[in-house]
Amino acid sequence: MKSPLSGQWSVIGGRFGLRLLLLVGVLWGSFNGPVALNAQQNKPWEKIPVPKLHDFKPQEPKRIELKNGIVIFLQEDHELPFVSGGVLIPGGSRDEDPAKAGLVGLYGQAWRTSGTAKMDGDQLDDLLESKAAHIETAGDDDSTAVAWDSLKGDADQVFALALDLLLHPKFNPEKLQLAQQQEAAGIVRRNDEESGIADRESAKLVYGANSPYTRQPELASIGSVTVEDLKAWHDRTIGGKLIIGITGDFDPVAMEAKLREAFESLPQAKPEPPRHDSFVGPKPGLSFINKDDVNQSNVQIMGLGIDRRNPDVPTLAVMNEILGGGFASRLFQKVRTELGLAYEVGGGFSFAYDHPGVFRVIALTKSASTVEATKAAMAEIAGLNSRPFTQEELDRAKDNILTSFLFRYDTREKVLAERERLEFYGYPPNYLETYKAALEKVTVADLTAVAKKYVHPDKLAVLVVGNGPEIKPGLDELNLGTPHSIDITIPMPKGSGGPAGAMEKMQ
């Protein structure tokens, strides 16, 4: 039924609505203005006590160690009828022969696509697709891995397929060639984006161009990899050093028995020799990479960091948040919000598990503001030693970190992955709990002390990737000496005649 007032309100809305709203607003302000202003000034909601976060007690997976040194983690989760698993295998690209840089990446691809003696990769694809299941392999700088997932009803069959791939791969020359072609395509395009260039070359400035952590595949090195190389790598790494994690809807007793049967017969792992990598940090100064097809710059300010075992890591994590961790950080507030010099700015210390991480501040800015943005970012870094930290900054940073910390481990699968990583690097199982407790205890005095200890602006290197004709003439204003130009030309194999010829030779 139509309301008897609907016609009147339509007239008011059409002809007098705006004046009526304005009149109501004026009257409301005259009657309520002092009250509203007083409420704004008092801000009573700020006095509402914020409850303390609950104690952090993640669901612990069951740890089982076999006689041959293989470690198994079982994490039950019966919410959904799925089972997923993975095998983490020590040994990655940092351990490969420099002359065959890229071997581990090729291995990670060809391993899965080649399949096994019982079932080739294409047949495996078809079977898994019919069951909405997955099996994947991959290579990283410190490890390789096999991972799988499936519905609970298919879990036994998919596990058997993954186990066969782990223990009895059949590396196919055609699949290796396909992986080489894909890798080669990535190599010839690696200078397309300034962000990729800046990240890659800044790491070289910190660790060194010949470091195992910055070594990059070239067309010649990936072209030299053979099927025999893949087999040799597999034989070298598969053994009693494995870390296995299973999560999902399974019976733990039956799962443990199945894993023991599958892995207890593998040989005892040989002790790995300790690593003796050298980390000296960057040479202070300014480096430049020309990319004249852009109108913006990627500025990176870098130094050598520390590893996670350092007891100062919790305090540095808080300092990171204050310096460049978000919208309220010093870098964001000054360089972007106040000065309007960058589209994006942030950074701080990163912490690797078994070697020093990198201190890195990144600013993305237009060409015309490159110098001013760099100066502003460097001033905020120096300010860590000259501008006192406040209790407000400390409280906000700790709250942000502790809240995000909980979300990082809010599922059993995430906790399992972290437990595996801690096991891989020999960290204590209660590392997460002690780390959180240390974060809660950080004080303003602690921040001042770590800034003095680790922040040394005179030891930092600066890399600018951008349009040379537009920005290079002004770089002298940074007072960092003569810019060192970095050559990022992609080396071509002898006799290849260029990228197209090099790609053709891999077909």
Residues covered by each model-derived region:
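Short, basic, low-complexity termini and linkers enriched in Ser/Thr/Gly/Pro
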Residues: 3-20, 24-39
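Short, basic/low-complexity N-terminal boundary segments at the transition from targeting/disordered tails
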Residues: 21, 38-52
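Charge-rich, well-structured scaffold segments of protease-associated domains
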Residues: 40-44, 65, 123-271, 315, ...
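Mature N-terminal segment immediately following signal peptide/propeptide cleavage
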Residues: 49-86
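Residues that act as N-cap/strand-start positions at coil-to-secondary-structure junctions
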Residues: 56-58, 129, 283, 446-447
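Short, surface-exposed beta-strand/loop micro-motifs that present aromatic residues
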Residues: 61-63, 71-76, 231-235, 284-291, ...
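Active/ligand-binding-proximal structured segments within catalytic/core domains
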Residues: 69, 78-128, 295, 301, ...
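His/Glu-based metal-binding/catalytic segments typifying zinc-dependent metallopeptidases
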Residues: 77, 88, 271-330, 358, ...
